[in-house]
Swiss-Prot record:
Residues 1-10 have a biased composition (Polar residues). Residues 11-26 have a biased composition (Low complexity). It comes from Escherichia coli (strain K12). Belongs to the FlgD family. This is Basal-body rod modification protein FlgD. InterPro entries: FlgD, FlgD/Vpr_Ig-like, FLgD_Tudor. The gene is flgD. The keyword Transport does not apply. Required for flagellar hook formation. May act as a scaffolding protein. One of its GO terms (cellular component) is cytosol.
Length: 231
């Protein structure tokens, strides 16, 4: 029995943006114009024996600059947000036709129609938050019966993917169909959290108001932040 292994160090490249309502465009310009008109009127009608202090004038002029600065800041943030959206769309579109590992437990097995064809299976994997000295994969059929137990051994923290050779416990070849995999991991006898991963093929990208989603065909859709590994 052979298992192909792929390991990826855990990284976090997620980017989140927050938008809020603000004064932009003509509203900000109108407010600035009104503010200047009121300030000029105040200066014209002030008591000449008690004129406005320099620090008061400076403070009010600073408020005008603040309004203008907020408008420019909103424009800049809008531009940055648009660039981030475009970058994420490009990143997502580059995944079309590629396999990805996402949270899940499904493993598919299939054998070609020709005589002597080798059974092929979709990869499965695990995500560990810390190193484990004992990792076991248990494969069950659609009825929940255990058909194979694989001793993976030690694994470092991170994302790891494997390929089952399609052999059952008795040495026979697994029938075509869908199987489930459960991962057990421990370190020094202490059970660890082990997130099982399944393989899916990215068939398209769906753009929406809430961001981009990946079309995984029969596996439905998922978001970029759910992708643990690209194969």
């Amino acid at each position: 029995m052979s298992i192909a292994v792929t390991t990826t160090d855990p990284t976090n490249t997620g980017v989140s943006t927050t938008s809020s309502s603000s004064l932009t465009g003509s509203n900000a310009a109108d407010l600035q114009s009104s503010f200047l008109t009121l300030l000029v009127a105040q200066l014209k009608n002030q008591d000449p024996t008690n004129p406005m202090e320099n620090n008061e004038l400076t403070s009010q002029l600073a408020q005008i600059s603040t309004v203008s600065g907020i408008e420019k800041l909103n424009t800049t943030l809008g531009s940055i947000s648009g660039q981030i959206d475009n970058s994420q769309s490009l990143q997502a579109s580059n995944l079309i036709g590629h396999g990805v590992m996402i949270p899940g437990t499904t493993v598919l097995a299939g054998t070609g129609s020709e005589e002597g064809a080798v059974t092929t299976t979709t990869p499965f994997g695990v995500e560990l938050q810390q190193a484990a000295d004992k990792v076991t994969a248990t494969i069950t059929d659609k009825n929940g019966a255990v058909v194979r137990t694989i001793d993976i051994g030690e694994l470092t923290a991170g994302v790891h993917s494997f390929t089952w050779d399609g052999t059952l416990t008795d040495g026979s070849t697994a029938p075509n169909g869908s199987y489930n995999v459960a991962i057990s991991a421990s370190n020094g006898g202490t059970q660890l959290v082990a997130q099982p991963l399944q393989f899916a093929l990215v068939q398209g990208v769906i753009r929406g108001n809430s961001g981009n989603t990946l079309d995984l065909g029969t596996y439905g859709t998922t978001t970029l932040d759910e992708v643990r590994q690209i194969i």
